[in-house]
């Protein structure tokens, strides 16, 4: 299937959803997914939800807010309290699962409050082979993964993003700040803040 055929599949899948809440981090994948959802469904049927937390870089939250403002997207920022999740501070190997499960539960509730049928996230085909405990939470909570369903990989998403005029097409991938610490090293808000400030220099 060609890259443009895959995009047509993505568009149709999004149309079939009727309405969607996109988990929006301002990264390459979620920005592309949000743009595709807006094209498929229109602004009235799409909301973007971004988590504000000590493990999410401040500059990414700012970029997410700016993108939604520029594109007229309803943007809801929810407070994620991952450090309050039992076990998270100890930085176990399933850290991403714990965080994503809490986050997607919150996004699911926000979707219901706004009469939105589906929650969607931006994982792609390249994520299938990696160790991604967060995808277990996605499956458990019935969150949609439209980019994987359309069999789009990262390079194809970058190419289509460029065609759509998205400035994120060549944006560097990033992971949450908690990933800077080896498994088993205790995570604190102070440590995460230090990392965020250091990486913004």
Regions flagged by a language model, labelled:
Residues 1-163:
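ATP-dependent adenylation/nucleotidyltransferase module used to activate substrates
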Residues 121, 151-201:
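Mid-to-C-terminal catalytic subdomains of enzymes
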């Amino acid at each position: 299937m060609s890259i443009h055929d895959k995009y047509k599949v993505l568009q149709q899948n999004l149309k079939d959803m009727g309405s969607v809440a996109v988990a929006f981090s301002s990264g390459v994948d979620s920005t592309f997914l949000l743009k595709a959802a807006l094209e498929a469904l229109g602004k009235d049927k799409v909301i973007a939800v971004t988590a504000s937390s000590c493990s999410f870089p401040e500059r990414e939250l700012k970029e997410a807010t700016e993108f939604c403002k520029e594109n007229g997207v309803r943007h809801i920022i929810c407070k994620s309290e991952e450090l309050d999740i039992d076990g998270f501070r100890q930085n176990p190997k399933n850290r991403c699962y714990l965080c994503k499960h809490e986050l997607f539960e919150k996004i699911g509730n926000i979707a219901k409050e706004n009469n939105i049928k589906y929650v969607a996230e931006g994982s792609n085909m390249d994520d299938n082979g990696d160790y991604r405990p967060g995808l277990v939470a996605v499956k458990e909570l019935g969150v949609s993964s439209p980019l994987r369903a359309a069999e789009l990989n990262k390079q194809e998403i970058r190419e289509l993003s460029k065609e759509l005029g998205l400035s994120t097409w060549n944006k560097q991938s990033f992971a949450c700040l908690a990933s800077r610490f080896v498994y088993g090293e205790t995570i604190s808000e102070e440590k995460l803040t230090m990392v965020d400030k250091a990486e913004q220099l």
